[in-house]
Curated annotation (Swiss-Prot):
A motif ('KMSKS' region) lies at residues 640-644. A motif ('HIGH' region) lies at residues 42-52. This is Leucine--tRNA ligase. The keyword Nucleotide-binding applies. Its main location: cytoplasm. The lineage of its organism: Bacteria, Pseudomonadati, Pseudomonadota, Betaproteobacteria, Burkholderiales.
């Protein structure tokens, strides 16, 4: 072995060794316990970031540890390769998205290999490969046949200049990101998946089928699915269209979870697209203009929640079903046509949004719920106004005096008797719109015939292959203009010339089942095969909390659809979920001459702190652009690493300077996996120094008689026949005590304490000085072998190199499959124990006694101790108190 630790040489040699033996290729083996661990597949954006390094190292540590414990472990990797960034890059660089994507995949794969990850690359998938997305199309056709997929109109963001649909993130302050044009809302047809058919099961299994998921994520899923128990009822009206027919049969339906407040309704609000709104707008230019204004707002519930609530009176009146009083109908920009019936009742006294709306537009407020001891203020909202648990109905006729539950039942019964309403369960969850008016995605397998309309592509003609030579120019859908995509296409029914569907699928489709394709990635005849039966469900899934809702919910839904189609047998795809914390770094900025913020790399800045250590200012250490060193900049605190904030750390730079093992070790040691990690350059240096200490100790150990390295000195047996000295026993006690804790921490995936345990081991080994005492060499060799195996999942390269170089592999085989060290319970037994010595209740020192000493022996040892004799001045104790294993107290 080379004397100096040179990480790049060590890591290249280890990786070459693993590559030569095809170390990570995994096959199904029914004789072994299986474990499937997977990180969420990355988008090939160009380079790995530190969040990737952390995620994949967590996965790698888990799989290596389990492999040493006899498991058949699968750790695959793939690429979530479709999506908008590739189109944006194509616009910027003038290259096809396919070229940009595959170049990025090649580079990021090389980075992963440099990290030493135990990935089975034979199972690699890229979602932009026709052999993969063929099965997206195949399952879509199956869902279409089963009625799970269907077509309807959808509201989208439309850029009138580029003549294209924009994703929500491409709309900035109501304008297109490229053209600056005011974005319009348009209704266009698209395909949806009936995820709502699975709402009850998706919700029910959150608590029963996801035992290894964080409670936070389960709560987020429950809230997103959003089961609501309430009443759906109608306000009647006599509003007729131009032909004289009643609009919606003279009924405007709403849903409420607070039917106990029905007598407090003072207005209703409808969505801008509601039939009553459109009817009223025909003779009302101001209302028509307001409806057009609403079309430039957000289309999602989240966007509507944050935007200013606006409304306009339609002039229409509906009738309250219980009071028969007239109720004004307003158009509200906060009401979505896609939610419920596109209309809501307004109860300003008991809903905070309605209260603000009523105060803004001078609408009546009627209190119908009272909490004992509270005073209602019509000018200021108070949280108790919406308290249904403590509230009692007032000003509500026959319902007055009722609790929430009583009033719900009574109101529902009354409305049902009138034929105007009924109790109903509704869901916040909406069907999944999968059509995207983009180029770089899975083509939807539909052909549009002038005679037969939308016709499914026959299965034998799959996949419908996406053209690879498109370079989007930002105007319109490239697939509309790509004649090669439509060339020779005929209707499967009548054979006449037709055109393909030019919408592509939402990229969440790609990521909803890739983990099943890993199980059988080369299968050309089936979407999934026998591999899925062996590996699924996945035992451990690892990814960011940002995917807690959509990706995980869609993956659960997709799995249930595949189950119902007989493709898999599992109900839930992921048994356990770990959401790793973000990697954070300092953020520094300064307003430029144009008013925009410029961000500075933290390594170019130094902080100015007060006496408490609080950062009070920051300045440039070096010149940056036209700014000289010493220029003051603003310190914005700690935030997530990102390109936009210029506070990222390039893993490649870290690996080239310190090695992959240091990068891996640092990201694991600094914080528990689920917690955020605050970047600290000094701690990175500390991780490197620790590995150098391990290497140096290995070099030192190589100078002693390594013939002693055999099965009896590597922790595999209890070493009963060796006469260990007192010092060697103490070393073995320390090593095996830490090993017991480290093993427990590995099982809990608390990798930060695993690393701290390894540091305790190297301290114990370095501090051992009795190298010539009985059994000393054996204890050292055993201890270092245990340390290498404990470190191996975190820092596999250095552990492999030392394991091979010191001869451990000759007995126990390659570290890949070496058995995990077993705790020697005999080593944990102590010959002597140290007890605290107190005199008159005050700690004065300690005594060492035999581990099996009796109470009398302990008393005598304490009385005979030098400390007691010195302080007692010849006096004898009046009383001796012994607490076994802890202390002895002499009362004088």
């Amino acid at each position: 072995m080379q004397e100096k630790y040179t990480p790049l040489d060590v890591e290249q040699a280890a990786q070459s060794h693993w590559t030569a033996m095809d170390a990570y290729r995994v096959t199904e083996d029914s004789s072994k316990k299986k474990f499937y661990a997977c990180s969420m597949l990355p988008y090939p954006s160009g380079k790995l970031h530190m969040g990737h390094v952390r995620n994949y190292t967590i996965n790698d540590m888990l799989t290596r540890y389990l492999r040493m414990n006899g498991y058949n472990v699968l750790m695959p990797m793939g690429w979530d390769a479709f999506g908008l960034p590739a189109e944006n890059a194509a616009l910027k660089n003038g290259v096809p998205p396919a070229q940009w994507t595959f170049e990025n995949i090649a580079y990021m794969k090389q980075q992963m290999q440099a990290m030493g990850l135990a990935i089975d690359w034979s199972r690699e998938v890229a979602t932009c490969d026709p052999s993969y997305y063929k099965w997206n199309q195949w399952l879509f056709l199956k869902m279409l046949d089963k009625g799970i997929a269907y077509r309807k109109t959808q509201v989208v963001n439309w850029d009138p200049v580029d003549q294209t649909v924009l994703a929500n993130e491409q709309v900035i302050d109501g304008k297109g990101w490229r053209t600056g044009a005011t974005v319009e809302k348009r209704e266009i047809p698209g395909y949806y998946l009936k995820i709502t058919d699975y709402a009850e099961e998706l919700l029910g299994q959150v608590q029963t089928g996801l035992p290894g998921w964080p409670e936070r994520v389960k709560l987020m899923q429950e809230n997103w699915i959003g089961k609501s128990e309430g009443v759906r009822f109608a306000f009647t009206h006599d509003i007729r269209d131009a032909s004289g027919a009643l609009i919606d049969d003279g009924r405007m339906y709403v849903f409420t979870t607070r039917p106990d407040t029905i007598k407090g309704v003072t207005f209703c609000a409808v969505a801008p697209e509601h039939p009553l709104a459109l009817h009223a707008a025909r003779g009302n230019p101001a209302l028509a203009a307001f409806i057009e204004e609403c079309k430039t707002g957000g289309t999602t519930e989240a966007e509507l929640a944050t935007q200013e609530k606006k409304g306009l009176d339609t002039g229409l009146i509906v009738t309250h079903p219980l009071t028969q009083l007239p109720v004004a109908v307003w158009v509200g920009n906060y009401v979505l046509m896609s939610y419920g019936d596109g209309a809501v009742m307004g109860v300003p006294a008991h809903d905070e949004r309605d209260f603000a709306f009523a105060k803004k537009y001078g609408l009546p407020i009627k209190q119908v719920v009272q909490v004992d001891g509270e005073q209602f203020d019509y000018d200021q909202w108070q949280d108790w106004y919406a308290d249904k648990q403590r509230g009692v109905a007032i000003n509500s006729g026959s319902f007055s005096g009722m609790s929430f539950k009583q009033a719900v039942e009574a109101v529902a019964h009354k409305l049902a008797a009138l034929g105007l309403g009924e109790k109903k369960t509704t869901w916040r969850l909406r069907d999944w719109g999968v059509s995207r008016q983009r180029y770089w995605g899975t083509p939807i397998p539909i052909i549009h015939c002038p005679e037969h309309g939308a016709v499914p592509v026959p299965e034998k003609d799959l996949p419908v292959v996406l053209p690879q030579d498109c370079v989007p120019d930002g105007s319109g859908n490239p697939l509309h203009k790509h004649e090669g995509f439509h060339a020779g296409v005929v209707c499967p029914i009548c054979g006449v010339a037709a055109r393909r569907e030019t919408d592509t699928m939402d990229t969440f489709v790609d990521s909803s089942w890739y983990f099943m394709r890993y199980c059988d990635p080369k299968n050309e005849k089936a979407m999934v095969g026998e591999g899925a039966a062996y590996w699924m469900p996945m035992d451990q899934y690892i990814g960011g909390i940002e995917h807690a809702i959509l990706h995980l919910l869609y993956a659960r839904f997709w799995t249930k659809v595949m189950r119902d189609l007989g493709l898999v047998k599992v109900d839930e795809p992921f048994t356990k979920l770990l959401t790793q914390g973000m990697v954070l770094n300092h953020i520094y900025s300064r307003k430029g001459e144009n008013g925009a913020k410029d961000y500075f790399w933290p390594n170019d800045v130094e902080n100015v702190s007060d006496e408490t250590g609080k950062v009070v200012a920051a300045k440039l250490k070096v010149a940056v652009g036209n700014l000289p060193a010493g220029t003051l900049v603003d310190y914005e605190g700690i935030g997530t690493m990102s390109k936009s904030k210029n506070n990222g750390v390039d893993p490649q730079d870290l690996i080239e300077r310190y090695g992959a093992d240091t990068a891996r070790l640092y990201t694991m040691f600094t914080a528990p996996p689920e917690a955020t990690l605050e970047w600290n350059d000094a701690a990175v240096e500390g991780s490197y120094r620790f590995l150098r200490r391990v290497w140096n100790f290995g070099i030192k150990l190589s100078t002693i008689d390594m013939i002693a390295v055999d099965e009896s000195t590597t922790g595999a047996t209890a070493l009963n026949d060796i006469n260990f000295s007192k010092e060697a026993k103490v070393l073995r006690l320390e090593i095996h005590t830490v090993l017991k804790q480290v093993d427990y921490d590995y099982q809990r995936m608390q990798y930060n304490t695993v690393v701290s345990g390894a540091m305790k081991m190297i301290n114990a080994l370095e501090n051992f000085k009795a190298t010539d005492s009985g059994g000393a060499q054996v204890a050292l060799i055993e201890g270092f072998g245990i340390l290498l195996r404990c470190l191996y999942p975190a820092t596999p390269h250095i552990a492999h190199s030392l394991w091979q170089g010191l001869g451990y592999a000759g007995t126990l085989g390659d570290l890949l499959d070496a058995p995990w060290p077993q705790v020697d319970e005999l080593a944990l037994l102590q010959d002597e124990v140290e007890l605290m010595l107190q005199i008159n209740g005050k700690l004065r020192g300690a005594i060492v006694v035999s581990a099996g000493a009796s109470k009398v022996e302990i008393e005598l040892a304490a009385i005979d101790s030098e400390v007691f004799r010195k302080l007692a001045n010849g006096a004898t104790p009046k009383k001796v108190i012994v607490v076994p294993g802890r202390l002895v107290n002499l009362v004088v």
